[in-house]
């Protein structure tokens, strides 16, 4: 028995365009994100599979625009909590915190944003 597995990233949000960290902030897709997704089609191999999305609006909107039929949300797929850094630009945080920011980023999934 074989399993099918695919990962799709949500469409573009205004915060993506502005370079802001989204984290768990429930930012919707931008107009550009909705338009770009409207020209995307999921390969037929994946038409009849179950799709699981983050509960965040941008992920649910993406699934709806792509016309994914069998969808459900799962809280375990929600974005990392970026705490006080949500809504801020990563480039600004790097300038502001210098070496300590780079060290924190180098921790990968163990990175600890404040708040």
Language-model region placement:
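Active-site-proximal alpha-helix that buttresses catalytic centers in soluble enzyme cores
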Residues: 8-69, 96
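Phosphate-handling substructures
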Residues: 66-115
């Amino acid at each position: 028995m074989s399993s099918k597995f695919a990962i799709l990233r949500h469409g573009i949000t205004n915060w993506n365009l502005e370079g802001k960290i989204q984290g768990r902030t429930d930012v919707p897709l931008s107009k550009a994100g909705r338009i770009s997704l409207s020209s995307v089609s999921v390969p037929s191999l994946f038409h009849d599979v179950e799709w699981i999305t983050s509960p965040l609006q941008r992920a649910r909107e993406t699934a709806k625009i792509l016309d994914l039929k069998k969808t459900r949300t799962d809280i375990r797929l929600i974005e990392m909590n970026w705490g006080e850094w949500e809504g801020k630009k990563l480039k600004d945080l790097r300038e502001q915190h210098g070496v300590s920011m780079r060290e924190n980023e180098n921790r990968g999934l163990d990175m600890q944003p404040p708040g």
